[in-house]
Every structure is written in C-alpha cells, then in structure tokens.
Curated annotation (Swiss-Prot):
The organism's taxonomic lineage, starting at the top: Eukaryota, Metazoa, Chordata, Craniata, Vertebrata
GO molecular function annotation: ATP binding; protein-glutamine gamma-glutamyltransferase activity; structural constituent of cytoskeleton
Membrane topology of this protein: Lipid-anchor
Gene: EPB42
Protein name: Protein 4.2
Effect seen on changing residue 112 to T: In SPH5; Nippon/Fukuoka
InterPro entries per UniProt: Ig-like_fold (IPR013783), Ig_E-set (IPR014756), Papain-like_cys_pep_sf (IPR038765), Transglutaminase (IPR050779), Transglutaminase-like (IPR002931), Transglutaminase-like_sf (IPR036985), Transglutaminase_animal (IPR023608), Transglutaminase_AS (IPR013808)
Pfam families per UniProt: Transglut_C, Transglut_core, Transglut_N
Subcellular location(s) per record: Cell membrane; Cytoplasm, Cytoskeleton
The organism of origin for this protein: Homo sapiens (Human)
Length: 691
C-alpha cells in the first residue's frame, strides 16, 4: 500500500494554491481550488526513492466527492501520475522531484463536479491512502468553464468583492444601502455546500445552471419558512434588532442553523442578497439588481388592477397582483448550452412557490435577453418577468354601493431605473437598457405587439391593453410632490386641475396619504382631506397643500413609504381622475469624514457627525462601527441624548489590517429610528519598505 513508497506526508500547499486560484480570502490552511486550473501538492517519502520510473508506474490518484462516489456519474476519478498529463480530464504530472519528495501538479476538468473532495493515493491496486481534502469551485478565469467572464474588473466585482450596495427607495429617490455579502467568511462555503447537498443529483453539480436553480429554490423555501411577521409594537432595543440588515452571513446562518439574525417580512428583499453571496462563494459571478415600480403577482398578464375608495385611499389588496415600489433579484453569469444561441450571459434567478415540479420546478433561470425580446416560449418565467417591467396599470374606484368605476389615471410606467452597483466603484449603474428597449421606440412597439399577439393566441386573454376611456366633458388632474420627505418634517404638494370644456364644473377633490411597505402592501392610513371646488370653463387651477407629519393619525411604521393619492370627480361625469406619487421618508444625514488613503497597520481616525433635524430629542443613541479589514470586530458606543438642532460628534480610531479598497460602515440606532447607516471607502496601501 502507500507505505510501499514510504509516504511520510502530503503538503497541499494551501496558501500558495489559494493565492493562485483567487481563494486566499477563504483560507490559508484549507485548500480551495477552481476547476480547470492546476494546483500543486508535494509528496514526502519516509525513505529515498531511487527508481523513479518504476515507482511512477505503480501509483495513481483518486479524487472523489459526494456520499456515494461513482465513476459513472463523474463524482469519482482515478488517474495516473505521469510525466505528460491530460489537461481535458483529471491528470497529475510530476513537475519536480528528488529522492525525498515529488512535486505534483494536479489538473481538474473545466466541467468537473464542484464540492468537497477527498484525494487518495493508490499503489499497485492496494488499499488507498487518504492524502487530504480539498474543495473544488467554479472558475470564471477559465475559458472552458461555463461561468467564464473575460473582463477582470467584472470578475473582481461580481465574484471577489464582499462590499456591496443594494438600491432601495423609489424610482425618484434611489437610496444606496451598504451590504456585506461576506462570501469568504469562514463558514459560508460549508453552509453553501451543506445547502446544496439537499439536492441528491450530485453528478449535476458540474452545471452552473442546475446549481443556481437548486440554490435559488432552496433559499426561497428557507425564506418562506424562516421569515417572521414584524411585531406591531416593540421596545427600542428589540426594534433596533429587528431592523438590522447589514449583511448576508448572519441571515444565512439563521436560515440554516437557527443561529444568527432573524429576518422579518418587511425585509424579505434580502433573499436576493443572500443568493448572491452563495453563488459568489461557489464561484458563479452574481449581482443584486433592483427594479423600481415592479408589477408582481400578475400571472404574466400585461394588465394590473389597483383599487381605491372614494376618498382616494388604497382599498386593500389587488385581485391580481400589485405594483411593488421596488423589487430585488439576483443575476448570475453563465452559458446556456441547452438554449438556442444568443442567451448566454446574465441570467435572472426567479424562485417561486413549489408547483409540483420538485425543487427545480420552483426556481427558473431566465436569460435577461429573453425578457428584453419577450421570448415567451423559451422558459416559463419569461412571461412573469416581462410583465413585471411592461405591464399597464388600471385604477378602479370602489364606490359605496359596491360597484367599480374605471378612473382616468396617468399611465404608471413599471420597470423603471433597473439598477445595480457599478463595477469597481460605488456609483449606481442603470441597466434598464438590458431589460427593455427605450420607452416609445420602434423596437419596444414591435416587441410589445408580438408579445400581445402571442398571449392572446396562447391564453385567450383579452386583458392586454387598458380599457379605452371616452368622455365628452374632460377634466385633467396633475399631482406634484417632492420625491422625499424628511422624517417628522413637512413639505408642500400641489394639485393642478384643468377644465378644457366650455362649462363650469363642480369638482370634489379627495387627497390622502397612506404608509405602504416596499411590496405595495398597505401599512397604515395616515391622513385624508376633501375639497369642494368650482372650476370655471377653460381654466387651470393649482391647489397647494401643506403635508405635515404632525397631522398624521400615527407615525409611519419603520421602513415604509408614503403613498400620496388624489382623486377628482365632477358632477357631469361618472369618470374620476386619479393621480399617485410615492414618497421616500428620509432620516437625518449621517456624515463620515475619513482620509481616502491609509497605510496598513497604521492608526486611522474617522469622524462621525449627526445633526438632529427632528422636532424631538434623539434618545438611547448607539453608534456601531464595522468594516472588514479595518476593524476586527464590530464596536458599539452609547451616547447621550441629542436635542433638536444639536449635533452629535464622535471620533473613532482603528488600525487597518488588509490592503486594498476597504469600507467603513457606521450605524446609528435611537428611539426615533433604527438602522440609519452610511459608509465610506478607504484605500489601504502596504507600508513602504525602508531602504
């Protein structure tokens, strides 16, 4: 057996190999390698080996993964140690040798099954000797790998960067949320493969399409099982905990082990970020994408109905879906060999409720190009995703007698400002052009007409275009409001009514404000006002109204938006005019001052300031600072109360330990709000060597 060669030990050269395979952030002790790329091990012998060629002919290596390794399903491979090797299959070549050791280069196939492997040595068919374990990952640097990404800057961003930005807010007030993907945290690789192991088709782990769909489905299932309803009331400390949303790793730990940070229903958008972490960890380039004004739950229909009462307030839930203020999704990069040519590149992970098709049946993988072109027959989810960014909204008025009346509402454009973090920077990149042709363009018209025709033929669904409205006595309504409103602040809104007819009109105007969650679900009714106006013939009238937090029936729940609506009705027509604006609630600005460049192992100081722009004191203030490569562990500091118009200032000193672009994240929690964050990036350079 192995003792015939007198094997003393095997050095897997983890630090060196991990450096060459872009996995050094995972570990310097455990071996993590990427498929299709050689890695080096060193065999040490107990006694000198004089006859090299005879000894070489007697030995072979076996690499195996999974619970039941098999050569048939490509989870086990036995291959000789030679002087040539086969770069297309498992191979091993002696690169250097002496009497005491052999340096062996092992190459894995570019389409090998990923996962935890055991490497064994076999001598002359006798019992195998375990040399050690390694983990094999996808390889975006290898042209033969299905996840190959040729741009180095994109590989650095979509695979190696742990500091992310996720875009929340509204289409008119996009807010960047600092996010720690943490794909190289110590236990993330094991948690990810543990999750993947629930799929017993290990032989298909060589296919990134299969792996992505399995992970998307399992994470969606975990989210549905683990996401908790947000309590209506909670103490300040509990509220601060509920709204923590700094990164993927605590969430992944909670979902898989029950230990970590819980997620509540108002934050279920984090699924896209957790999926991005797991995909990047396994070697699949991925990014989080946000679509503003996204039509969800339409069943692929290109019409979405919204219902409002006579006061202009949203009347419960739509029968067929609703428009989300924003919706996050995960894109991953890979080839699609099973699809027609032209659908390689970015794919959208689209999990859904299980429909009897097993794990894969509850997560589709949709080429972005298929959504843009409206290729409905390519894969089932194209229809849903196309509708999400192209549907038309129809607004109905629910009358007191139970009848529904169609309103004349301005077209709500869905699928706006589709955004993701820019490559190598903190800027917001608009990628709407990847998903749809320009609004009003000939290409957009052609795609929509083709999709409408196909839907009517396939589904016999006439609900494609909004119902036409005709009125002999038109009234026009225009609503203007700021894109954001300071927390506990005030603003001016204006309503413009235009009477183009030759007759005077008696108009009833209803204006309302509601708090809504990001997914369009009503959270609270806050304020309403009714006006009775007389509008002269051929006249335009502008009504200006103050919007004050102090007039609201209650404070808007944390992490909600204001939905401002206006509905105008006149006596000569049953047709009401309707307009709506979504307003982001902005909290006080958290300012961070810090040098743009710092030296490794040299103290660095950051200054943090927060002015209380509210009308009440900020009490129970806690500042937390964190940053991988800058601060070993999160630090938290308690501060005194900050009175209105006063400013809280603090300085923090820490010592950077990692070279490269690092990010400091600062968070403030108090009785008035939780999870107020900001971030600042710093480039850490290695110390100059003294002459």
């Amino acid at each position: 057996m192995g003792q015939a060669l007198g094997i003393k030990s095997c050095d897997f050269q983890a630090a060196r190999n991990n450096e060459e395979h872009h996995t050094k952030a995972l570990s310097s002790r455990r071996l993590f390698v990427r498929r299709g790329q050689p890695f080096t091990i060193i065999l040490y012998f107990r006694a000198p080996v004089r006859a090299f060629l005879p000894a070489l002919k007697k030995v072979a290596l076996t690499a195996q993964t999974g619970e039941q390794p098999s050569k048939i399903n490509r989870t086990q491979a036995t291959f000789p140690i030679s002087s040539l090797g086969d770069r297309k299959w498992w191979s091993a070549v002696v690169e250097e040798r002496d009497a005491q050791s052999w340096t062996i280069s092992v190459t894995t196939p570019a389409d090998a099954v990923i996962g935890h492997y055991s490497l064994l040595l076999q001598v002359s068919g006798r019992k195998q000797l375990l040399l050690g374990q390694f983990t094999l990952l996808f390889n975006p640097w290898n042209r033969e790998d299905a996840v190959f990404l040729k741009n180095e800057a994109q590989r650095m961003e979509y695979l190696l960067n742990q500091n992310g930005l996720i875009y929340l807010g509204t289409a008119d007030c996009i807010q960047a949320e600092s996010w720690d993907f943490g794909q190289f945290e110590g236990d993330v690789i094991d948690l990810s493969l543990r999750l993947l192991s629930k799929d017993k088709q290990v032989e298909k782990w060589s296919q990134p399409v299969h792996v992505a769909r399995v992970l998307g489905a399992l994470l969606h299932f975990l989210k549905e099982q683990r996401v908790l309803p947000t309590p209506q009331t909670q103490a300040t400390q509990e509220g601060a905990l509920l709204n923590k949303r700094r990164g993927s790793v605590p969430i992944l730990r909670q979902w898989l082990t029950g230990r970590g940070r819980p997620v509540y229903d108002g934050q279920a958008w984090v699924l896209a970020a957790v999926a991005c972490t797991v995909l990047r960890c396994l070697g699949i380039p991925a990014r989080v994408v946000t679509t503003f004004a996204s039509a969800q739950g339409t069943g692929g229909r290109l019409l979405i109905d919204e219902y409002y009462n006579e006061e202009g307030l949203q009347n419960g839930e739509g029968q067929r879906g609703r428009i989300w203020i924003f919706q996050t999704s995960t894109e991953c990069w890979m080839t699609r060999p099973a699809l027609p040519q032209g659908y390689d590149g970015w794919q959208i992970l689209h999990p859904s409720a299980p429909n009897g098709g097993g794990v894969l049946g509850s997560c589709d993988l949709v080429p972005v190009r298929a959504v843009k072109e409206g290729t409905l027959g390519l894969t089932p989810a194209v229809s849903d995703l196309f509708a999400a960014i192209n549907a038309s909204c129809v607004v109905w008025k629910c009358c007191e007698d139970g009848t529904l009346e169609l309103t004349d509402s301005n077209t709500k454009y869905v699928g706006n400002n589709i955004s993701t973090k820019g490559v190598g920077s903190d800027r917001c990149e608009d990628i709407t052009q990847n998903y749809k042709y320009p609004e009003g363009s000939l290409q957009e018209k052609e795609v929509l007409e083709r999709v409408e025709k196909e839907k009517m033929e396939r589904e016999k669904d006439n609900g494609i275009r909004p119902p036409s409205l005709e009125t002999a006595s038109p009234l026009y309504l225009l609503l203007k409001a700021p894109s954001s409103l300071p927390l506990r602040g005030d603003a001016q809104i204006s309503v413009t009514l235009v009477n183009h007819s030759e007759q005077e009109k008696a108009v009833q105007l209803a204006i309302g404000v509601q708090a809504v969650h990001y997914n369009g679900v009503l959270a609270a009714k806050l304020w309403r006002k009714k006006l009775h106006l007389t509008l002269s013939a051929n006249l335009e009238k502008i009504i200006t109204i103050g919007l004050f937090f102090s007039n609201f029936e209650r404070n808007p729940p944390e992490n909600t938006f204001l939905r401002l609506t206006a509905m105008a009705t006149h006596s000569e027509s049953n047709l009401s005019c309707f307009a709506q604006e979504d307003i982001a609630i902005c909290r006080p600005h958290l300012a961070i001052k810090m040098p743009e460049k710092a030296e490794q192992y040299q103290p660095l100081t950051a200054s943090v300031s927060l002015q209380n722009s509210l009308d009440a004191p900020m009490e129970d203030c806690v500042i937390s600072i964190l940053g991988r490569g800058l601060i070993h562990r999160e630090r938290s500091y308690r501060f005194r109360s900050v009175w209105p118009e006063n400013t809280m200032c603090a300085k923090f000193q820490f010592t950077p330990t990692h070279v490269g672009l690092q990010r400091l994240t600062v968070e403030v929690d108090c009785n008035m709000f939780q999870n107020l964050t900001n971030y600042k990036s710093v480039t850490v350079v290695a110390p100059e060597l003294s002459a």
